[in-house]
């Protein structure tokens, strides 16, 4: 369907967010005539979301910007079960304490994108543990479980993937689909919520909730999914050679976050500007026309705009300036990520492989060795060819720092502590 009446669907369509909608005309009509409450679920499986989940946060952002009410549902209850959708194996179960700690950490990110409060379209953050932990199992089976067909649940692609590979799917995980469907109904009852959004891998789970709502007498519920994004080269969003691109500042610096977006492939620039920034579409179209070396200016704008939304404009501009000094002027900027190494350790000397791991440029000595042997590692801009090299205080420059580099884009300053 094209020519949406509602600002929300029109915005999402123009920017490339929409993969599938359960009832386009019905949802469009509803959004055009009243304030709609909608939610997306987030699993607290780590202390931070990563950039792969940013598209979902942006959907909630545009929902609020077009006059509707966003709800971020934290899976404090379902997080203890684990979503089996398109996973190759069962996920490690998490304790209540770990989930609570992760939720508290994740909450900080949402305040950068959404306005929370008591207004008509102010955002809410809700924990499904509030109702799931108090369920009476026998009553739940009688009132909710009877509405689910096991035959139909087995037909979902997310389940078939595991079964076709002859991999175990526990009863615990199988129940996740029922619990997520129940969330939709419970949120409708508590907050009048009518729309659930998510990635395209969640389609089956969301439709389950719509069907359950129909059987339990809720008003018409709706589903909207976004595409599962990969880069032009097929890499998953939110991952890099150095690991996950975390959204929390205490897990990834604003500079490293900026660099991730600066390194966007040429073919992805226009798409990412539409999805991850709030720049006007005509400005994005202008930037998309840039070619050759000029495309790098569009990448810098992308990096700065995405970083500004998450970390603030000052941090984004500082990251951009640090990159300019480092890569264009050849200066050693003190705004680069810094790692302290005990003076005694530097005096005695530390192996370059261990230093790479300590600086979080690599996760293992083996990975660091491969980078050294591949010629990707430099100390103070001098190539390192021997993985047995020992780095000591003699490498400190006039500023009392050691510049450790992996490739052309990743740099860390080593400072005696």
UniProtKB/Swiss-Prot annotation:
GO molecular function: ATP binding; RNA binding; tyrosine-tRNA ligase activity
Reactions catalysed according to its record: tRNA(Tyr) + L-tyrosine + ATP = L-tyrosyl-tRNA(Tyr) + AMP + diphosphate + H(+)
Amino-acid positions noted as binding ATP in the UniProt annotation, renumbered to this chain: 239
One BP term from GO: tyrosyl-tRNA aminoacylation
Keywords: Aminoacyl-tRNA synthetase, ATP-binding, Cytoplasm, Ligase, Nucleotide-binding, Protein biosynthesis, RNA-binding
Motif ('HIGH' region): 44-53
Stored Pfam families: SYY_C-terminal, tRNA-synt_1b
Record-listed L-tyrosine binding positions: 39, 176, 180
Domain S4 RNA-binding: 350-417
PROSITE patterns per UniProt: AA_TRNA_LIGASE_I (PS00178), S4 (PS50889)
Cited InterPro entries: aa-tRNA-synth_I_CS, aa-tRNA-synth_Ic, Rossmann-like_a/b/a_fold, S4_RNA-bd_sf, SYY-like_C, Tyr-tRNA-ligase, Tyr-tRNA-ligase_bac-type, Tyr-tRNA-ligase_bac_1
Chain segments annotated as transmembrane: none
HAMAP family: Tyr_tRNA_synth_type1
Subunit structure: Homodimer.
Stated family: Belongs to the class-I aminoacyl-tRNA synthetase family. TyrS type 1 subfamily.
Name of the protein: Tyrosine--tRNA ligase
Gene label: tyrS
């Amino acid at each position: 369907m094209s020519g949406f009446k509602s600002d929300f669907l029109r915005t999402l369509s123009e920017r490339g967010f929409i993969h599938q909608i359960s009832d386009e005309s019905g949802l469009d009509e509803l959004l055009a005539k009243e304030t709609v409450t909608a939610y997306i679920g987030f699993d607290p499986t780590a202390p931070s979301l990563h950039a792969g989940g940013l598209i979902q946060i942006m959907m909630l952002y545009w929902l609020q910007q077009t006059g509707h009410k966003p709800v971020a549902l934290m899976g404090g209850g379902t997080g203890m079960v684990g979503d089996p959708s398109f996973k190759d194996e069962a996920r490690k179960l998490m304790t209540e304490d770990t989930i609570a700690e992760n939720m508290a950490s994740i909450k900080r990110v949402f305040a950068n994108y959404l306005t929370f409060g008591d207004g008509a379209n102010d955002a809410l953050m809700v924990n499904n543990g509030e109702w799931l932990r108090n369920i009476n199992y026998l009553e739940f089976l009688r009132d909710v479980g009877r509405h689910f067909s096991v035959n139909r649940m087995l037909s979902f692609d997310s389940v078939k993937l595991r079964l076709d590979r002859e991999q175990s799917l526990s009863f615990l995980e199988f129940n996740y689909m029922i619990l997520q469907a129940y969330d939709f109904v419970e949120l409708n009852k508590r907050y009048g919520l009518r729309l659930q959004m998510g990635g395209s891998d969640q389609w089956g789970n969301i439709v389950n909730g719509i069907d359950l709502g129909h059987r339990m007498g809720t008003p018409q519920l709706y589903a909207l999914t976004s595409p599962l994004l990969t880069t032009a080269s097929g890499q998953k969003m939110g991952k890099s050679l150095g690991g996950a691109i975390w959204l929390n500042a205490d897990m990834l610096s604003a500079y490293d976050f900026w660099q991730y977006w600066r390194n966007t492939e040429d073919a992805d620039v226009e798409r990412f500007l539409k999805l991850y920034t709030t720049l006007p579409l005509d400005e994005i179209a202008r930037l998309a026309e840039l070619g050759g070396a000029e495309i790098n200016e569009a990448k810098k704008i992308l990096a700065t705009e995405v970083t500004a939304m998450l970390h603030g404009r000052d941090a984004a501009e500082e990251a951009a300036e640090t990159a300019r000094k480092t890569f264009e002027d050849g200066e050693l900027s003190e705004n680069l990520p810094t790692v302290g190494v005990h003076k005694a350790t530097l005096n005695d000397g530390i192996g370059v492989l261990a230093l790479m791991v300590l600086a979080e440029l690599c996760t293992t000595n083996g990975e660091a060795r491969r980078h050294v042997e591949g010629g990707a590692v430099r100390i103070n801009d001098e190539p390192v060819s021997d993985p047995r090299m020992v780095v000591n205080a003699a490498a400190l420059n006039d500023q009392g720092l050691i510049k450790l580099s992996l490739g052309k884009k990743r740099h860390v300053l080593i400072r005696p502590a």
